Amino acid sequence: MKIKLIIAAMAALAVSACSTLKDGEYNLSVVSTGDGHGYWFAKPIEAGGKARGSLMAQSAFVNGVRAEKGADNVILVDAGDNFFGSGAPFYYNYVDTTSSHLYPRLASYMKYDAVVAGHSDFESGHRVYDRVAKEMKKEGIPLLAGNALSDRNGKPYFPAYSIIKKGGVKVAVLGYTNAANASLMDGSCVSGLRFESLLPLVQEDVDKVRSKEKPHIVIVVAHTAMGKGDGLKLEKQGLDLFKSLRGVDVVVTGHDHANKVMSADSIVVLDCGRTGQNAGVTDIKLVVKGGKVVSRTLDARMTSIKSEEYDTAMEEAFEADYDKVRSFITGTVGEIKKGLVSREFYYKQCDYMNFLHALAMSAYPVDISLSATLLIDGKVPAGEVRYQDIRKVYPYENKLVVLRLTGAEILKYLEASYDAWINTMTEPYENAHVLKIKQSKDYSTGKMAWKLAKSPANFDSAAGINYTVDVTKPYGSRVVITDMADGSKFELDKEYTAAITTYRSVGSGGLLKAAGLEDMKSVEDRIVYRGPEFRTILYRYFKKNGSIDPAVVGVPKVVGSWKFVPEFAPAAIKADVELLYGK
């Protein structure tokens, strides 16, 4: 994808206040990357892994551009999300916290001119991004985020822009993170910070920088999705910037992992893909006469990066780091004592769900855990677990959220959950189904097949209490909570701390709304703790306990008990499950 712009006449007016250049032609190239998410190494870090896009492959591409254009004529920028989201950054973020962080060293090796802090970089937490920013500063690379403001003084927590000289040309690079960061992550990750909308802030900053620094070229790098350009989404302000900015040559965006390039009037915008698979290139030609820029040409394109063509010198330079990361990723972190079968959750309390509840209850002293299955019909085999297996054991990027719920609200929550799960049946009869299933066309086979009527991602059960679910009763009267797991009284008007996932906390499944929390403000007002990703909790659980043992995670005085009644119900639901998945 390639776009070319030629701007003349008014260009002289736009840059008349810039610092003087000698008459002649100046040719620069802006190479832009983003959303690498820690895919730094060309070789796979997992046992049995396959080669894929990498920072080292991007480095080879950048080397080629520099060889063609001249190193002093190439500007290298990144739109963020570089040190969070995969195994390699996890190692340097949370395991080896005493060595110098790898990302600043990699960025220095590639000679980045400026890097933006993406939303995932903030998600790593203060200890990580503060450390990375400090080390990048030592390497001479600014970590930019001009709209991340300190609550203490209202000023940018990270620099808003950087001035660089390339080929005699003065270039201003302004950098911004996602304006919706506060709603995209746990509040503790960004404590003491607030995030401003990019509109009108970026234009205001551009005007100030042009007045103060008098650059010849202005680049805005923002970790924001392209969006629709309608000004309605804080998380997606890329096209808003593209349509409204004046005095800017190049806008680089990220966050949505898209691969796009567009142009209009005197500006181009590029969205740089993900995980080392793409790079943007904008060739800029300035023509100077009488000390003024009288025309400029912008030629923007997106390039696919070949994973097999990587920087072998860079690979050799960081071989020791690769070895440390691979050793950690492929190393044993714990053991699962007995295989866990997820499909059992449909019709009874099971080891698999006890394990999920135990994870939440191990991370914070909650009264009750509320959770749905992660595997619709799967198995977690017994045996050793390597770090690279943690994503298989816990396949989603959920985080722990703890909030206050009354006993009455918990009861309503569970009633709504089981209503999505089961039909009312007073007695068993032929061709009846307790589990809510239906027949519909399977488009992979063209045949009719049994499917769940509702998503099992919203089939929450509870731990920490003892209760029954009566399938003969209608919605609103099925769940009977007898007492707490430890035998103490369960009270409808008492407040309890309950563990849920971030998926549930944003309203997914409608269970909190059914409990009486009508909107996000109602939920936010009840939150008492925001925890880490459950994968991190699982890793810590293994490090502390060594294993997942059903005999330990299923202790009745901790997780409590629940069951379907009357006696025919579990067998009837099991038969329905076998219609779905076979015996």
Give the residues covered by each predicted segment:
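Acidic, metal/ion-coordinating pockets
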Residues: 19-308, 347-359, 369, 529
